[in-house]
A protein has these predicted regions:
Chain B
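Bacterial N-terminal signal peptides that target proteins for export
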Residues: 1-8
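Bacterial N-terminal signal peptides
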Residues: 8-17
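N-terminal periplasmic/intermembrane-space "pro-region" immediately following the signal or transit peptide
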Residues: 22-103, 391, 420-423, 453, ...
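Outer membrane beta-barrel
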Residues: 79-260, 266-267, 297-302, 306-315, ...
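Outer-membrane beta-barrel pore domains
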Residues: 103-107, 154, 161-165, 176-179, ...
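Surface-exposed loop/turn segments flanking beta-strands in extracellular/periplasmic regions
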Residues: 208-218, 271-280, 374-376
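Flexible glycine-rich, low-complexity coil/linker segments exposed to the extracellular/periplasmic environment
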Residues: 225, 245, 265-269, 276-281, ...
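Loop-centered beta-sheet repeat module
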Residues: 269-326
Length: 193, 527
């Protein structure tokens, strides 16, 4: 009896240790720095032109108007944005945004196409102890091609992650904020960057 | 002529005298004037000196004020940094829940229940390390100990009184240290939640929409110990990404594990016409393992492996194996396994869990127990004490050859737009109403009903098969993800003519009450 238990115990640990390291992910952490962020959402981009948009009270007021029922938990002092080109062709904008999860801010980058739709979203910094699954590509893929008309809410148009509902809701808020900023400041009237 | 000359002389002398006198006065005046001017100059200089001094003093005061201001600002910054660092390293949270219940039972038809308040703390001693704690106060209102020691009646009198309320419990639901050895391998040790099924590891009340926990996990525990079930041990956990195939999540621990442990109950009873009674009942039942010296020379293993092909979809298998008998009884083990899952399709969710627990050789354990205890009970015969009876009794409880059961819960989330402008919607970003239906069944096969023994020999072991099912339907309102208002109707039924109290740990049914209807209203919150 004892030896069987010992056998089972000793079997489990090495089996787990033997798993390939690059297959496994962590919760908290810094996953992208500011320089890497636009490349994460526009990997095909060749030129990244940084532009800092000050977050003035007038801009916030306009953003509030477009955000409707979505109420940001953070108003950034300024928005770090990148105009992304591939050999001269304009691909879109990358906007760095922040929103509070349960206790702490989540920082992420939103890639926005010239038509005002989401190209991609990538997590830059996750500071919560739980809910780090929002970092996964398969979760972030849900935001592809979403625009301002989308609710971006769990159980509406975004599949929730059990135990991370607040983080899921935060990412949705942040994506909306980035889309609104693009609409007001980055894209021209014809919807071109 | 002479008179004219005389007049001239007199006038000259007079004028000379006057002139001399006048000249002397002007000199004096000039001197005085100079003296005054000098004094004025000195006063001016003195004033300038004083002004300079004042200016210097004012400048010094201003500099001093600036210095104080700077120091205060620096102190404030320091305090802010310290508190921010502390906030970064330690996060306090928690959850709590209360319930009102009205039911059809004869004995107790309605009650408020303080389900629990759990305080959580999450700290990071260093970047790859984490300490997590959940301290639970369940059905808790107070616990007070009074003790007096004093000489009395020619001897020493020590009196002790424990004051508390029924069911009050303080417990560490979790208390562990985690070291992320590599980003892909996390080592955890301490009081960890046993990963058998999905409820135990996701047991926070504010995550669920019905104000009563499931039968297999709590009310008729098929889990070896009712949830929340932590054990002291160590192990590993992590997530394994499989690319397009999704994600695997694993947890694997070696723990002290469940053991038959004694619960000592004191009963004082007045009876008429029988003798009044003072009873000491020692009940041995499967209990959470000790945090001190393990009472068995054997550890248990528990592991869970979950596969999530897509977000919102998960299926998992879990397993528990370990000795459940203390060292002084024959060596017998528990084998338990669970299958659980979650699927999400838009606003619909289905979540389910099946648990199967097998206590090996319950009859052998009963015989072994009889051998060790020798006599099931001992009391003072009425011939010795005609009005008062004292008894000590040993019992085996909570054992069954096999227990198994499941719960399956369907949820539909919606929000009528007309509520958006009301108080239920206008303050919240994503309020939800959730319609819930939960179905549950439990089978208890070979449930030990009575074990009688005398002189170290088991004389009777009565076992029975019992079945119980429950259906719950309700509506929950979630203004935010952390807060839920719960309303549900619940119907519970066991074998015809048999009491629900015999198989559940939450329904005070009488011996003929085999069914119960209940309305549950609850609030659960997290922060």
């Amino acid at each position: 009896m004892l030896s069987r238990r010992h056998f089972l115990t000793s079997l489990l640990t090495p089996a787990i240790v033997a798993l390939a390291p690059n297959l496994i992910s962590a919760q908290e952490g810094v996953f992208l720095d500011e320089e890497e962020a636009p490349r994460a959402v526009f990997p095909e981009g060749t030129h990244f032109e940084k532009k800092v948009v000050p977050s003035t009270e007038a801009l916030r007021e306009k953003m509030r108007g477009l955000l409707g029922r979505t109420r940001p938990s953070i108003w950034e002092d300024a928005y770090v944005t990148y105009l992304v080109r591939r050999h001269g062709e304009r691909l879109g904008f990358a906007v760095i945004a922040e929103e509070i999860g349960k206790h702490r801010p989540i920082t992420f980058v939103v890639g926005i196409k010239p038509n005002g739709k989401v190209k991609d979203v990538a997590l830059m910094v996750y500071r919560e102890a739980y809910g780090g699954e929002v970092r996964e590509r398969r979760f972030m893929r849900q935001y592809h091609d979403k625009d301002l008309a989308a609710p971006l809410l769990p159980y509406r148009d975004i599949v929730n992650i059990a135990g991370a509902t607040l983080s899921v809701q935060s990412i949705g808020r942040g994506v909306k904020k980035a889309l609104v900023l693009a609409q007001l400041v980055l894209l021209d009237g014809a919807g071109r960057p | 002529m002479k008179r004219l000359l005389t007049l001239f002389v007199v006038l000259s002398v007079g004028l000379t005298a006057v002139g001399t006198a006048l000249g002397a006065t002007l000199d004096d005046l000039e001197r005085q004037l100079q003296a005054i001017q000098k004094q004025i100059q000195e006063l001016k200089e003195e004033k300038q000196r004083q002004d300079q001094k004042i200016r210097e003093m004012e400048a010094a005061q201003a500099a001093q004020k600036e210095e104080v201001k700077k120091e205060a600002a620096s102190l404030r910054e320091q305090a802010r940094r310290v508190s921010s660092e502390l906030a970064e390293r330690v996060r306090i949270g928690g959850y709590g829940s209360v319930r009102f219940e009205g039911n059809s039972l004869k004995e107790q038809s309605n009650t408020f229940t303080f389900r629990r308040f759990v305080l959580t703390a999450d700290a990071k001693p260093a970047d790859p390390m984490q300490v997590y704690m959940e301290l639970e106060f369940e059905r808790f209102t107070q616990l007070e100990l009074e003790r007096t020691t004093r000489p009395q009646d020619g001897g020493l009198r020590v009196a002790q009184a424990i004051e508390g309320t029924d069911g009050s419990e303080i417990s560490f639901e979790q208390l562990w240290f985690q070291y992320d050895l590599y980003p892909w391998l996390k080592f955890r040790t301490g009081q960890v939640l046993v990963p058998l099924g999905r409820f135990n590891i996701n047991h926070d009340d504010n995550r669920w929409n019905i104000a009563r926990r499931s039968l297999v996990d709590r009310g008729v525990p098929v889990l070896p110990v009712k949830s929340a079930w932590p054990e002291l041990g160590a192990g590993f956990l992590g997530d394994i990404r499989l690319g397009e195939l999704g994600k695997l999540t694993y947890e694997a621990y070696v723990i002290n594990g469940v053991a038959l442990d004694a619960e000592v109950e004191n009963i004082a009873q007045t009876r008429d016409p029988r003798r009044d009674k003072l009873e000491l009942e020692v009940e041995f039942q499967p209990s959470r393992g000790t945090a001190k010296l393990d009472m068995k020379d054997s550890k248990a293993v528990a592991t869970r492996l979950a596969w999530s092909p897509y977000p919102g979809q998960e299926i998992a298998g879990s397993f528990y194996y370990g000795r459940y008998t203390p060292q002084f009884l024959s060596d017998e083990s528990i084998v338990a396994f669970a299958i659980d899952g979650l699927t999400t399709i838009g606003p619909f969710e289905i979540e389910a869990e099946y648990v199967n627990t097998h206590f090996r050789n319950v009859d052998r354990v009963a015989r072994s127990f009889a051998r060790v205890v020798v006599d099931q009970s001992a009391n003072i015969p009425s011939s010795v004490s005609p009005t008062f009876e004292a008894e000590v009794e040993f019992e085996l409880a909570g054992l069954a050859r096999n227990k198994h059961g499941y719960w399956i819960e369907g949820r539909y989330r919606f929000w009528p737009e007309f509520l958006t402008s009301t108080v239920f919607g206008k303050y919240f970003e994503n309020p939800q109403l959730i319609a819930i239906v939960r179905g549950e069944q439990v089978w208890l096969n070979g449930l030990v009903r009575e074990a009688e023994f005398e002189g170290g020999v088991l004389t009777k072991l009565e076992q029975e098969n019992r079945r119980l099912y429950r259906v719950t339907a309700g509506l929950a309102y979630r203004p935010t993800p952390l807060v839920v208002f719960q309303l549900a109707y619940e119907y519970t039924k066991t074998d015809k003519g048999r009491s629900l109290a015999e198989v559940t740990n939450f329904l005070p049914a009488q011996s003929d009450e085999d069914e119960a209807h209940a309305i549950l209203v609850g609030v659960a919150f997290g922060f």
